């Protein structure tokens, strides 16, 4: 955990990001933005990660919606997303895009 790591948490219970009403999600991310700005200006963070996990498969361990605002100081500050993109293989992108559009 880095100095200034902050959680933005809703008072009302929602299991995860997908359950939060749109008007409240905008307020949560407005607060997260203010915290990020303060981390950079006042704590002299070099950058910031904004993170929320949805369900256990994505790493959610606390089943109450929250947003991590994580100040970053350098590459050795102990936080690592370890995201290594892989080729998408045999997915048919137009079909995947069409499937996603159905849910919007």
Name what the model sees in each region.
Residues 1-104:
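HIT superfamily nucleotide-processing domains
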């Amino acid at each position: 955990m880095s100095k200034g790591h902050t959680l933005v948490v809703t008072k009302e219970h929602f299991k995860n990001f997908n359950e939060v009403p749109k008007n409240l999600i905008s307020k949560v991310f407005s607060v997260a933005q203010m915290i990020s700005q303060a981390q950079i200006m006042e704590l002299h963070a070099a950058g910031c990660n904004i993170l929320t996990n949805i369900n256990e498969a994505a790493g959610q361990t606390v089943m109450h919606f929250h947003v991590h605002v994580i100040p970053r100081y350098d590459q050795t500050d102990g936080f690592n997303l370890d995201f290594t993109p892989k080729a998408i293989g045999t997915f048919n992108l137009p079909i995947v895009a069409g499937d996603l559009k159905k849910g919007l």
